Amino acid sequence: PLAPVVNEQDLQVLPVIAHVGYPQAADEYYQLLLALRPGRVAGLAEIVVNGQPFTVTDATEDELALTAWARILLEGTPIAMDGSWQLHRRRAAPEPVRFAKRFGGEQSNTSIMVGDAIIIKMFRRLEPGDNLDITVHNALNDAGISSVATLYGFMSGQIPAEEHIPVDLAMIIERLPQPRDGWELITAKAVDLVDVTDLVAGLGQCLRTIHEALRHTFSTVEIDGSRVADDMVRRLDAAVVTAPALARYRGTLTARFEKLRGRHLAAQRIHGDFHLGQTLLTPGGWRIIDFEGEPLKPLAERRLPDSRWSDVAGMMRSLSYATSAHARPTAPQTLTWARRASEAFLTGYGWPNTAEQDVLAAYEADKASYEIVYETLNRPTWVDIPLSAIRAMGQD
């Protein structure tokens, strides 16, 4: 257990960390939020405490349990019995807790909606150290950046191991008003090839503002372009094994990678997994969310500075993917729509100079080769979307 049990009437809410061990792999830790009620219910799990049986259920599926838990986090002052569980308040929450419920969409973490103005984002799989999403939101809030949600606070604890490893457990963040999912918005317009240039130009400006703030807040470094090129070539060769269709385009892709050799690339803290699904359009403009980086990468790698053009390339590829909503995603007029959208995004962000264009081109190629592997394994009917982009790269 991470903290004292939260009691409300006969309901008890208990956060715990599950330790999953593997004989030949690193251990993993997962956060669970349990609801306990006295008595037994057929078919449900139970535990016995001091001779008293309790039915155990998933508290994230129980609105009464979630509301009780949210009240403690936002209105109370919980203190762990062993000192391992802490609540860190950064800014005052805007309203008292009236109700809480779990967001029903598919997510890698658990989002709890608290009223109309707050989200508690509970991290399921725990990683030692500071959570990037918390770190970046806090820094951008301090810098006065309005294109991210307000961070009200976060919760931290310790993984129950001999070393008492510190870990972030959840963040309490603003629930943005009237949000429209960026992916759903742009793909809906792609169906009829409706012009989106003004929309995506604004998104480019938003990303540039965030990059500038991150550059001033966190340290910047130079990275070896040859090492970046080596990494891209290595990923491409591994991709060819999974997706043999890539083999004929290896020369096209590596030609882009090779232009990085002998260069020193400016690197900084970036978003790390930037695409339309990480954006929301609100009445106040674009907002960018989820600064945890690519979920499949280890935390240590996600913490490393990278070129800002990696984020730009991610959005360029995402705009290309938006054409999947059209009946003929690879038709000339559809590709023209995607090209104009990408150009507008770049205009909003700030067109790269000649040297930076080569960096952007390399990152685009790297992301497209990854996409072909992903589609080969998961959505074979979509393979032609990144493949058509790679074909076009060969014609540049």
What residue ranges belong to the model's regions?
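Short, Gly/Pro- and small/polar-rich lid/capping loops
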Residues: 1-10
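Conserved ATP-binding subdomain of kinase catalytic cores across diverse folds
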Residues: 13-15, 21-233, 284-285, 294-329
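An alpha-helical support segment within catalytic cores of ATP-dependent transferases
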Residues: 91-99, 236-270
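All-alpha amphipathic helical-bundle segments outside canonical DNA-binding/catalytic cores
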Residues: 198, 353-363
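Pre-DFG segment of protein kinase catalytic domains
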Residues: 269, 287-290
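Conserved catalytic-loop position in the HRD/HxD motif
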Residues: 273
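Hydrophobic residue at the +6 position relative to the catalytic HRD Asp in the kinase catalytic loop
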Residues: 277-279
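Active-site activation/catalytic loop segments of kinase-like enzymes and analogous catalytic loops
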Residues: 293-350, 365-380
